[in-house]
Amino acid sequence: MQKIGIYPGTFDPVTNGHIDIIHRSSELFEKLIVAVAHSSAKNPMFSLKERLKMMQLATKSFKNVECVAFEGLLANLAKEYHCKVLVRGLRVVSDFEYELQMGYANKSLNHELETLYFMPTLQNAFISSSIVRSIIAHKGDASHLVPKEIYPLISKA
């Protein structure tokens, strides 16, 4: 059976921090599913279709990465792909508290599911989608925080 990991997120928009985690985690799996979440509760700046397109553009050089859109329980998506490992990033202590709860919740729904946590590299530790959204909302230049393939798409927002 193929070793498959899932890296879920809203990716509103995808950042260099996300791509760093995709790069490092894709080396651990035969296949990495990047699951772009619907996340209507977060009121995303970009539509699910736009976010999926951005992620596909940003990850096109990764041969073992597949991008999918999803709505619903992550534990169910993991079962659908026969995946036993979720990939998550941790930047700050508050991320850990939230991710720990989510990891336990996912484990309670799918007992085979483990969560693998990645710390960001130093140059990406401060980057978040919310920082990027704030910069572009105020007409600032966020090109150094996002993959070059998607900057033209987000700078129009």
Curated annotation (Swiss-Prot):
Substrate binds at T10, K42, L74, R88. ATP binds at T10, F11, H18, G89, L90, R91, E99, N124, A125, F126, I127, S128, S129, S130. The record marks H18 as: Transition state stabilizer. It is found in: Cytoplasm. It comes from the Bacteria. One of its GO terms (molecular function) is ATP binding. One of its GO terms (cellular component) is cytoplasm. Keywords: ATP-binding, Coenzyme A biosynthesis, Cytoplasm, Magnesium, Nucleotide-binding, Nucleotidyltransferase, Transferase. Its cofactor is Mg(2+). It is an enzyme of class 2 (transferase). GO terms for biological process: coenzyme A biosynthetic process. It catalyses: (R)-4'-phosphopantetheine + ATP + H(+) = 3'-dephospho-CoA + diphosphate. Its EC number is 2.7.7.3. Pathway: Cofactor biosynthesis; coenzyme A biosynthesis; CoA from (R)-pantothenate: step 4/5. Belongs to the bacterial CoaD family. Homohexamer. Reversibly transfers an adenylyl group from ATP to 4'-phosphopantetheine, yielding dephospho-CoA (dPCoA) and pyrophosphate. This is Phosphopantetheine adenylyltransferase. The lineage of its organism: Bacteria, Pseudomonadati, Campylobacterota, Epsilonproteobacteria, Campylobacterales. The gene is coaD.
